[in-house]
Amino acid sequence: KRLKSNFHMQIKRVVVTGLGALTPIGNNIQEYWSGLVNGVSGAAPITYFDATKFKTRFACELKNFNVTDFIDRKEARKMDRFTQYAMVATDEAIADSGLNSEDHNPDRIGVIWGSGIGGLETFQNEVLNFAAGDGSPRFNPFFIPKMIADIAPGQISIKHGFRGPNFATVSACASSSNAIIDSLNYIRLGQADAIVTGGSEAAVTIAGMGGFNAMHALSTRNDSPETASRPFDKDREGFVLGEGAGALILEEYEHAKARGAKIYAEVIGGGMSSDAHHITAPHPEGLGAKNVMLNCLRDAGIKPEDVDAINMHGTSTPLGDIAESKAILDVFGNHAYNININSTKSMTGHLLGAAGAIEAIASILAINNSEVPPTINHFTDDDQIDNKLNFTFNKAQKREVNIAISN
């Protein structure tokens, strides 16, 4: 027999009430937006380690960042860099939102955080230390707690006293986008009043650079790092690795309105998909990208022609950019030519598990400022990409943005 239920669900509206960013082109929201609209490249020679023998000797590192300006030195030593970045970005977002556990029910505030790799530097250093020793298993007691991806949302909740849903999403470059969608749905279904969400990554390490070089995924344009990330350009030849964090406060609309919160935007839908094709290469016709955008539009209850701007995944890889641009034409048809399309990875590099968060923030800021950041470093059209599409090449464009998608 089927069980009867008196449960009637009312889907709640979800808004963004706080933002925080720590990126290669700015260490807070104001600096990040300035870097975006001014077309600043975050790429430069690697300073974290001697990269002389690496195929790629540059990356998008953070600039002028000292963790002890934000976190006590003793506490910082217990955290991998990806967690440190998460703490800094979420502190900014929480302060921006005015949300706290003293004035609001902490059992109804959660943390859902994305990271594609987690504590890679911690893992790398512990293994290197072991390999250099006599075989005795001398490991730091913080090795595992520093390394696991779920430690970032754990540390955030401990600091701020948030006792709602708490977990990490690990889905490679989609990690923080998935975290945002999970947060959206938890609030929609009434399981939380607010959720701190986003993602962080700190993979500019010996292991990170070496591993991605072995995959032939990275640009090797060592003579001109600042022009290496060039999405949709004919001469693109790989992505540029970045690092940092992006944080958003998602909140139930009535809860935000009741406390007089500043509202940046409403999150009206999210889509997820897999192309079930290959471990690294995209489906040649962009099937995964096509399905995820269709799912997003369906979930949001809007039509393709309602969309004004799309911040593409746009990694500057030979196959990926072609596949994603095909998907946009398939989904949006002739309306695709009316949309401002861009890739902020041309400036920030690819932040892996944090990419979705900082790019969602860029889309939100585009709505608030009526300006779409550029896709920099375009020099030569690629005849395999429809260049009648407006990729917002090289210079930001002013326009009204009511609905934006972040891929």
How would you describe each model-predicted region?
Residues N6-V16, D103-P106, A300-D306, Y337, ...:
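Flexible, low-complexity linker/loop segments at domain and module junctions
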Residues G133-N140, I181, N185, E201-A258, ...:
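Glycine-/small-residue-rich "gating" segment that lines the acyl/pantetheine channel
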Residues Q191-E237, G270-P284, G314-D321, N338-N390:
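Acyl-CoA/ACP chain-elongation machinery
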